[in-house]
Amino acid sequence: MHELSIARSIVELVEEQADNRGASVVEELELEIGHLSGVEIQTLEFALDSAIKGSKLEKARIIRHYIEGEGQCSDCETIFPMNALFSPCPHCGSYLVKILKGKELRVKSIVIKKE
């Protein structure tokens, strides 16, 4: 379950940024999570809920943006929605696809409070 280590890394990163700015509390955390990122979204959410306990993020509002997968066929250049990493082009059937969106897994922003 690598989602727990990802959740812990998110908490460490955010707490480090809060500490560097002299903040005692993180009020808001905004995440972008792509459907093609390779994480189980529900498992990550559960792990994050567990990882924030006792941290500066414990009472933070967590905003999650889910990014749908999108790819472009390298053969016919059709842009199409992707449900899986190895989705074929719906136009020509090619598997030579460049992923345009959906692999994101990042902290987009944090809101901190100094006391």
Curated annotation (Swiss-Prot):
Family the UniProt entry places it in: Belongs to the HypA/HybF family.
InterPro entries reported for this sequence: HypA/HybF
GO BP annotation list: protein maturation; protein modification process
Keyword vocabulary terms for this entry: Metal-binding, Nickel, Zinc
Organism: Parabacteroides distasonis (strain ATCC 8503 / DSM 20701 / CIP 104284 / JCM 5825 / NCTC 11152)
HAMAP family in alphabetical order: HypA_HybF
Annotated Ni(2+) binding sites: 2
Pfam family, one: HypA
UniProt-annotated binding residues for Zn(2+): 73, 76, 89, 92
Gene that this polypeptide is encoded by: hypA
Gene Ontology molecular function: nickel cation binding; zinc ion binding
Known role: Involved in the maturation of [NiFe] hydrogenases. Required for nickel insertion into the metal center of the hydrogenase.
Annotated protein name in UniProt: Hydrogenase maturation factor HypA
Keyword Cell inner membrane found: no
Cross-referenced Gene3D superfamilies: 3.30.2320.80
